[in-house]
């Protein structure tokens, strides 16, 4: 993390529980990010907070630090807690898993138990873990409601509630589910409630604040919606040149870790086929990919076993993957806010990043709304058709995926 990105607030100077302070220090957390520096003095004092900050600014560690501190300072050693004391809700299962992973070092240090509850996979396995006892339940609304209605867990002992990517949960229509779960928890005055998101509309704040106790709203205003450390670039390819331009730019840029976004599952599969045939270590992440495969792909990408991830917007929000160097918008998104969410995968936590977008014949009409929303024109670059790489015969999904150890190379084509 870049030092100039951090604030002057040290974690060691905050009134943290000694176990939390020690775990953070051991993990290398010294200075707070701006959102942490603003939110923690509020939440550590037991007051509700709604935090808005640009993607990748440390929101997750802000609410995890406050959650573990609150539970450790509000527990009776003479009591056993058969049900969860904290509930962390996320819009997607991938984000829930990432929050759980981020919480591991705090759980290990504190002895507090975390458990996951998300749909699509592992129902019985998740149930077994929860039945063994859980202090902090992290999950998606649907699966948590299932367990509540079955009597597997109760929410009457909840001391902390977190809504992560809150606006996304409202956008996805989870408002009724959220309110159902919050009504099962103690009253807002009897718990600590935190909302964090990259964007929090007035409507979302109004709805959410009905279930919060006089929250304090804080915001880290970015220099621009897209992040000043992201270098943006725009091409106007013909539909015929589009795929060849992508492969050529991959060779020219040689990204260390890259996400390519497209608007449809079919287009993602097509892109994957050409990139795989061109010798790239590439994974495909769409809504149709089985849950175990999705988690495996994300781990491979995070661990560096895959260099490129081709994804629909199912992966555009909440994926906390560090060191993404490049984002390609193969298709300009129909929703202008998705442009910000997509390219927010790079340039995180003070690092620099590159965003390259294609305004093709099919989606160029989306560009004016995007540029109006981000408040600036995206710099345009030119290309020469005769300099584009020749397209290989693409792989199809029914064919075997190249071995993960397949080596990327620059000599596959002659430029």
UniProtKB/Swiss-Prot annotation:
InterPro entries (alphabetical): DEAD/DEAH_box_helicase_dom, DEAD_box_RNA_helicase, Helicase_ATP-bd, Helicase_C-like, P-loop_NTPase, RNA-helicase_DEAD-box_CS, RNA_helicase_ATP-dep_RhlB, RNA_helicase_DEAD_Q_motif
SUPFAM superfamilies: P-loop containing nucleoside triphosphate hydrolases
Motif Q motif mapped to chain: 9-37
EC class name: hydrolase
Domain Helicase ATP-binding, chain residue ranges per copy: 40-218
Pfam families in the record: DEAD (PF00270), Helicase_C (PF00271)
Cellular compartments annotated: Cytoplasm
Domain Helicase C-terminal: 241-389
GO biological process, one term: RNA catabolic process
One annotated Gene Ontology cellular component of this protein: cytosol
Superkingdom field: Bacteria
Family: Belongs to the DEAD box helicase family. RhlB subfamily.
NCBIfam families reported in the protein's UniProt record: PRK04837.1 (NF003419)
Self-association and partners: Component of the RNA degradosome, which is a multiprotein complex involved in RNA processing and mRNA degradation.
Task performed by this protein: DEAD-box RNA helicase involved in RNA degradation. Has RNA-dependent ATPase activity and unwinds double-stranded RNA.
Protein name: ATP-dependent RNA helicase RhlB
Organism: Haemophilus influenzae (strain PittGG)
Classification of source organism: Bacteria, Pseudomonadati, Pseudomonadota, Gammaproteobacteria, Pasteurellales
């Amino acid at each position: 993390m870049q030092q100039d990105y951090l604030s002057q607030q040290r974690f060691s100077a905050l009134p943290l529980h000694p176990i939390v302070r020690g775990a953070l220090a051991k993990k290398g957390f010294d200075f707070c990010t701006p959102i942490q520096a603003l939110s923690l003095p509020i939440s550590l004092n037991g007051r509700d907070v709604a935090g808005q900050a640009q993607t990748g600014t440390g929101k997750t560690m802000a609410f995890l630090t406050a959650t573990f501190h609150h539970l450790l300072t509000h527990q009776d050693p003479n009591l056993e807690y058969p049900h969860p004391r904290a509930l962390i809700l996320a819009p997607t299962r991938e984000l829930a898993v990432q929050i759980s992973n981020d919480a591991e070092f705090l759980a290990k240090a504190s002895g507090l138990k975390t458990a996951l509850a998300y749909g699509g996979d592992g129902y019985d396995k998740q149930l077994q873990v929860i039945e063994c006892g859980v202090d902090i339940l992290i999950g998606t609304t649907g699966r948590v409601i299932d367990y509540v209605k079955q009597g597997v867990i109760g929410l009457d002992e909840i001391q902390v509630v977190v809504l992560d990517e809150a606006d996304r949960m409202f956008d996805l229509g989870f408002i009724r589910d959220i309110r159902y779960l919050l009504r099962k928890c103690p009253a807002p005055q009897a718990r600590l409630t935190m909302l964090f998101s990259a964007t929090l509309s007035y409507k979302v704040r109004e709805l959410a604040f009905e279930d919060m106790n006089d929250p304090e709203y804080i915001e880290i205003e970015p220099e621009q919606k897209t992040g000043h450390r992201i270098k943006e670039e725009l091409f106007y390819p013909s539909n015929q040149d589009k795929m060849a331009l992508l492969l050529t730019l991959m060779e020219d840029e040689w990204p260390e870790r890259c996400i390519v976004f497209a608007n449809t599952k079919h287009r993602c599969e097509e892109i994957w086929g050409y990139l795989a045939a061109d010798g790239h270590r590439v994974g495909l992440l769409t809504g149709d990919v089985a849950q175990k495969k999705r988690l495996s792909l994300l781990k491979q990408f995070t661990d560096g076993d895959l260099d490129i991830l081709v994804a629909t917007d199912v992966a555009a929000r909440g994926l906390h993957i560090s060191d993404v160097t490049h984002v390609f918008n193969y298709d300009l998104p129909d929703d202008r806010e998705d442009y910000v969410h997509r390219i927010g995968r790079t340039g995180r936590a003070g690092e620099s990043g590159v965003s390259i977008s294609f305004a093709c014949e099919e989606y160029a009409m989306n560009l004016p709304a995007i540029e109006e929303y981000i408040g600036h024109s995206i710099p345009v670059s030119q290309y020469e058709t005769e300099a584009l790489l020749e397209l290989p015969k693409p792989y199809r999904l029914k064919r075997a995926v190249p071995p993960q150890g397949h080596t990327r190379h620059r000599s596959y084509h002659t430029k």
